[in-house]
């Protein structure tokens, strides 16, 4: 999308799609996004390509949410250069602790060189299983290092959350009464309190 929209001059507005939910729009990607990092390396202003596209439509939306891969790729750097803040989902696993350290370092570099307004909105614990010692340890470690940033809401391991994408639906449409859907509703409430205050 980053490159197709530039090539045919339709801009980002030409690839924004309405959904069945009022006020929710998507810009879909596909498997060709894998090659985007390679293409970006040869471009001028490569860290600001996504920001330039978002600036075309930013005033048309109250919030723009970008879902990024967990790897620190040039696409992720583009998202950080364009973002106001980051919401970082962390699986409750040991290696996630190392990953958050690398992400915070990258965020600091982006803030220093590309986007001084970038903030850490919060850290979201996912794949949370309160029955395991590891989950409790990871949660405690993150809460001790980032006391104001870890959301109270946690996203549990949940079968319905895992099933929903295979049915082409968000969990709130697939099974709104599931524990996973309830957790995301609670997260939205907690996030809005943070954003509004």
Language model segments and positions:
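P-loop NTP-binding core
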Residues: 1-197
């Amino acid at each position: 999308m980053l490159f197709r929209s530039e090539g045919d001059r339709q801009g980002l507005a030409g690839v924004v799609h309405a959904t069945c939910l009022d006020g929710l729009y998507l810009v879909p990607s596909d498997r060709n996004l894998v090659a985007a990092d390679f293409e970006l390396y040869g471009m001028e202003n490569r860290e600001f390509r996504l920001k330039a596209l978002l600036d075309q439509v930013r005033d048309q939306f109250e919030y723009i949410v970008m879902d990024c891969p967990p790897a620190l790729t040039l696409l992720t750097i583009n998202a950080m250069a364009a973002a106001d803040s980051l919401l970082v989902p962390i699986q409750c696993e040991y290696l996630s602790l190392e990953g958050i350290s690398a992400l915070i370092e990258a965020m600091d570099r982006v803030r220093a060189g590309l986007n001084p307004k970038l903030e850490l909105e919060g850290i979201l614990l996912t794949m949370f299983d309160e029955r395991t010692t590891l989950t409790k340890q990871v949660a405690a470690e993150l809460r001790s290092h980032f006391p104001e940033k870890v959301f109270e809401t946690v996203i549990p391991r949940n079968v319905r959350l895992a099933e929903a994408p295979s049915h082409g639906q968000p969990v709130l449409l697939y099974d709104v009464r599931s524990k996973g859907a309830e957790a995301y509703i609670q997260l939205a409430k907690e996030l809005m309190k943070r954003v509004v205050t």
